[in-house]
Amino acid sequence: MDFVVDYQTYAMADTAAPELPEPEPRLNLTSDAQSQPTGILDLQFKLPDLQRYSNNNATLPVDNDGAGSKDLHKKMTHYAMSSIDKIQLSNPSKQLGQNSQDEKLSQQESQNFTNYEPKNLDLSKLVSPSSGSNKNTTNLVLSNKLSKILNNYTLINYQATVQLRKSLKVLEENKERLSLDEQKLMNPEYVGTLARRALRTDLESQLLKEHITVLEEFKPIIRRIKRLSSSVEKIQRTSEKLLSNETNEVPTNNVVLQEIDQYRLKAEQLKLKKKILLSIRDRFTLNQVEDDVITNGTIDNIFFEVVKKVINIKDESSFLLTLPNLNAGNALIMGVNEILEKTNKKIFNYLIDFLYSFESSSNLLNDHGTTEQESLNIFRKSLVFLSSDLELFNELLKRVTTLRSKSILDEFLSQFDMNSTTSKPIILSAHDPIRYIGDVLASVHSIIANEADFVKSLFDFQDEDLKDTPISILQQNKTFLKGIDNKLLNDIIQSLSNSCRIRIEQIVRFEENPIINFEIVRLLKLYRVMFERKGIQDDSSIINNLKSLEDISKNRIIGYYEDYMKQTVMAETKNSSDDLLPPEWLSEYMNKLVELFEIYEKTHAAEDEESEDNKLLSSKNLQTIVEQPIKDVLLKQLQTSFPLAKKNEKEKASLLTIEINCFDLIKSRLQPFEGLFAQDDDSRKITIWVCDKLKEYTKQMLTLQIKFLFENTGLDLYSNLVNMIFPVDSVKDELDYDMYLALRDNSLMELDMVRKNVHDKLNYYLPQALTDVQGNLLFKLTSPMIADEICDECFKKLSLFYNIFRKLLIHLYPNKKDQVFEILNFSTDEFDMLIGIDH
């Protein structure tokens, strides 16, 4: 920096200055008189005394002694020429042509100044125009001089030159920051001098400050040296004393050595103690960086590493409580608890902020530049660490439940907004209630599916998320954390249970059609299963509401048939059925039952896993809609329609006919659904009871028709008499007829009496017996199979008795066989042919 200040030496200073100050030795700008021999001085050119010429306006001699002249311009010319000559001398390796040209130029300039004539000078031209030219020449010369100095690597002080170059380079690089005015600094006038001095002052002040700072840093070192100097000197003296001892034997009673040994042992103990304390400090305390991470750091993996260290400190500090003095352990545990409380609150706030911004965040990167997957991993890890504080963790779950419950409830209710422009609203239609319920349940299922995806994306913990978790947290909360997503989902969905139930219940409670109600039951059951597959627990409120709605629909189905029996059937009881066909209400009722059974069988597999009480067509409900209407309504109505059936056999025949028709209708309609009634013993008893009743009435009808046949043929009296002694059906051979020998003494068995009672009736009725039975009475049975069965059985009984009775008379009156043939004049074949029996 010396050159920066000494640059003023070459400026155009005032001519009143006595002498031009010499530059610093570094520039090596010694005068011609100092550096060159006298022979060279004779070659210097001389400038005219322009001032004297201008003042005296006369011809004056020119002073050729440029070096000794006090004129500023002459001195500048002298130094310029000296510099040029020195440059020429220092570069002898230049080409000869170049040197000759420089010498010619020097000689020409010298001759010009030597041959200078005052008469040719014009003061105004010499002073004014030439002053700028002289300055430019001077600056050019100085610039060349400076370049030569900076590029001269042959100088002795090479390091100083390098440092100078670096200093100038530093100034050039920091020109803008230091607000350096290059033009002002390079100005050769007084303004430049002031600027350079100011720059030097500033640089020296800054350098002085830095030196002072360095010296201040040495103060503690010096103080420590002064403090330890006495001990070091003592050790040095002792060591010199020991080394001066020529013998290797050291006396055992040397107090100094014993003292040194004690100090050495004490020093080792102190080192060990220090090492232990440092280890304890590193293990049970946080450094400044870790404390800053806890206080000011963001929630990331580094933060969790620090929290993990704090938890480990808490877990490992329990041994301090076993010490006699519990202060250290209590203080450490209290400090750790405060840090954990602070971290848990910070994690809690982070989780709340994350939840609020998760839905609205459309960018895959958050404010800290982490990806969405990394953010989710940090979120789960935050939940794991927060689970150690149950109060804050439960508060977080409540916040999440409240936030998401409100969100999904608003979304669900918006589906019913008639003024909504975003989506088509769900409209209740009286013509299609099933579609309305399906839309409601589909909307709920969509919300549950979306919410399940949302919850599982945040709260579904995998083993990978728990691998870096402290053991103390895993032992307490691992099982709980793995099921937190389902628990949270069920808590959130509870907000939809009442709103969903209200909108479905208004349809279920007022729907009367059992088929529609059954479709509603199927729909509710289907979505209940779908909800459970999405993670909704079977004991949650929304599932319980769906079950209650199912029960309401099932009760409405059963109630419909009960109401039908109470209302419709009561109107039918006032009219008796003259055609002996089943009443119309029974046919309609069975049609409705069959329609229900048909649609039920299609979905019967869906109820296999349900309990008996929850089934729609359980044994209890089947008894209600099948057995009870028959017992309590149908049979009572038939008894009411034929009040004389017990006294009048024809009335009884009509009653049996309509009963057979009714039970045959019931059996035929229920027979395709035997599998439905075979689910348990109680249900199976219903169909068995119907079949038994039909058989019972058929048997009664058969007995009654046989009685009618025997009465019409006149054989009824003899049938009773013969069967009283020995059943006709039991007669197998001729010996069995001996059982009837006692009948000879009975007057009714006399042939004349038999002729009187049987012959005319038999001959009159037998030809028309088949037509009478089939046409007049059995024609009213709706089942041809039952009618044929009764008819065939009646005539078989009649044919059997006629054949046995004829043989019995022959056996009783073997001598009157012709008379017997006259009374019972139809042979067996003829008799069978007339009544339509085929053998």
From Swiss-Prot:
One Gene Ontology cellular component: Golgi membrane
Does the keyword Zinc belong to this entry? no
Q: Does the keyword Transport apply?
A: yes
Its main localization is Golgi
Gene Ontology BP annotations: intra-Golgi vesicle-mediated transport; protein transport
Q: Which keywords annotate this record?
A: Golgi apparatus, Membrane, Protein transport, Transport
Annotated compartments? Golgi apparatus membrane
Bilayer topology: Peripheral membrane protein
InterPro entries, alphabetized: COG6, COG6_C, COG6_N
Indicate the family of this protein.
Answer: Belongs to the COG6 family.
Q: What does this protein do?
A: Acts as a component of the peripheral membrane COG complex that is involved in intra-Golgi protein trafficking. COG is located at the cis-Golgi, and regulates tethering of retrograde intra-Golgi vesicles and possibly a number of other membrane trafficking events.
Q: Can you name this protein?
A: Conserved oligomeric Golgi complex subunit 6
- The gene for this chain is COG6
